[in-house]
Design a protein with these regions (language model features):
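Conserved catalytic motifs of ABC-family nucleotide-binding domains
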Residues: 194
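Catalytic Walker B motif of ABC-type/P-loop ATPase nucleotide-binding domains
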Residues: 198-201
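Helix-to-loop junction immediately C-terminal to a conserved catalytic motif
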Residues: 87
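Conserved ABC ATPase signature
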Residues: 173-177, 181
Length: 303
């Protein structure tokens, strides 16, 4: 009986090995080999503005291979703009962004398309196709960017969904699952092509504590399992500090502090201290700048 079982398993093992071989060598998956520079992403002396409104100023950041790096700061400080520059959606006025040694702003349309196939992106609110099933959402990048057979696509999608705990929900549509589950589907889609770089834009926004903790664990575990480099933009201190290797703090388009989560928890920098401890007043004031209340009430000159 055992020999019979073994003989039945051998063809399955061969098919599995063949599938893996096809996946990596003969399927249409991008075959770009980036130079093995220590930092997968480098930002140097970067300036970016919308017209006269300066968004980023003299930015310098490193994102080492295999690490999970967080970019934190208040709303409007330029965090998401950094992700858009890395993805080549916008171009800097000065300085450069390099991914795998390539200057992103110098790439033509074909070069950008090739580069983006090596990236995974989790958008702030998932951006799932609401008229497609969960399975079809995750299958979408595989069908767009590879020549895999439907059988292989099916197996890969089910494996990705299994990794986020939603294989048995594959036939449902996004409107039939919770917001936390939808975020996990978006994670599965982001890793569909086993990207070298994964960018997460506010992955914890709007999630309940259970979904938030689960999503944080997924991001860390997937980063390590895939050997990818992850860039995490977030406001959520506890979840981000629990999984990040290194953190950049931004304010008004500049890096105001950086370090490991442990270092930043004990930082004496006023901005970092206010942000980490959720203090209501500090470098980011409670009151909008302007006249004092006494002046506004006409009491400023009274004795």
């Amino acid at each position: 009986m055992c020999c019979s079982d073994a003989s039945e398993r051998l063809p399955k093992l061969r098919r599995a090995k063949q599938a893996l071989w096809l996946l990596h060598y003969n399927t249409g998956f991008p075959k770009t080999e980036y130079p093995l520079v220590p930092n997968l992403v480098e930002i140097r002396d970067l300036e970016f503005a919308y017209g006269d409104r300066k968004i980023l100023s003299n930015l310098r950041m490193d994102f080492p291979r295999g690490k999970l790096i967080a970019v934190m700061g208040g709303s409007g400080c330029g965090k998401t703009t950094v992700l858009r520059l890395i993805g080549g959606q916008i171009r800097p006025q000065r300085g450069e962004v390099r991914v795998g040694g390539e200057a992103v702003h110098k790439l033509n349309t074909e070069g950008l398309y090739r580069l983006r196939r090596r990236m995974g992106m989790l958008f702030q609110f998932g951006a799932l196709f609401t008229d497609l099933t969960i399975f079809e959402n995750v299958a979408f990048p595989l069908r767009e960017h590879t020549n895999l057979s439907e059988e292989l696509i099916r197996n890969l999608v089910l494996m990705k969904l299994n990794a986020v705990g939603l294989r048995n929900a594959s036939k449902l549509k996004p409107g039939e699952i919770s917001g936390g589950m939808a975020r996990r589907v978006a994670v599965a889609r982001a890793i569909a092509l086993d990207p070298e770089l994964i960018m997460y834009d506010e992955p914890f926004a709007g999630l309940d504590p259970i979904s938030m903790g689960l999503t944080a664990s997924l991001i860390r575990n997937l980063n390590d399992a895939l050997g990818s480099t992850s860039i995490l933009v977030s406001h959520d201190v506890n979840e981000t500090f629990a999984i990040a290797d290194y953190v950049y703090f931004m304010s008004a388009g500049k890096i105001v502090a950086e370090g490991t989560p442990a270092e930043l928890r004990v930082s004496t920098d006023p901005y970092v201290k206010q942000f980490v401890n959720a203090e209501p007043d500090g470098p980011v004031p409670f009151h909008y700048p302007g006249k004092s209340l006494a002046d506004d009430l006409g009491l400023g000159t009274q004795r």
